[in-house]
Design a protein with these regions (language model features):
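Positively charged, small/polar-rich N-terminal and surface patches that mediate targeting and assembly
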Residues: 2-126
Length: 126
């Protein structure tokens, strides 16, 4: 991990860079596991496992394996919008949680890629 302190600024902030893995998990909004929406179950599981971060996005339109278009259009109310969960952390942490994802995802898609993380941390709001 590379870390540097900003120069010439009144605020004291740190910038650090590292290599990580970005997982993109594509599931449906109607997917559930143990009585709760699958996306919430996954986010709660990731947090409990100490994963660095995860964000859930709800798509406004999309199609998948069955080529059915899902949209938020008033004329075509869909109860199964596409859900994307982005997860980023160190490779060893992602590898550790992969089997847990395999257990809970019955239908969907996961993509994985190496990414460079640039993290900024400032004490100006503290």
């Amino acid at each position: 991990m590379k870390t540097e302190r900003a120069r010439g600024c009144e605020e004291n902030y740190m910038k650090s860079e590292s290599t990580a893995i970005l997982l993109r998990i594509f599931i449906g909004e109607s997917d559930h596991y143990k009585g709760k929406p699958l996306y919430m179950y996954i986010v709660e599981m990731l947090k409990a496992e100490g994963i660095a971060g995860a964000t859930v996005f709800r798509g406004i339109a999309g199609f998948g394996k069955h080529s059915r278009i899902h949209t938020t259009s008033i004329l075509r109310l869909s109860t199964d919008m596409p859900i994307l969960i982005e997860v980023s952390d160190l490779e060893e942490n992602i590898e550790r949680i992969r089997p847990k994802l395999d257990e809970v995802i019955n239908q969907g898609l996961i993509t994985e890629e190496k990414v460079k993380i640039v993290f900024y941390d400032s004490d100006k709001n503290k």
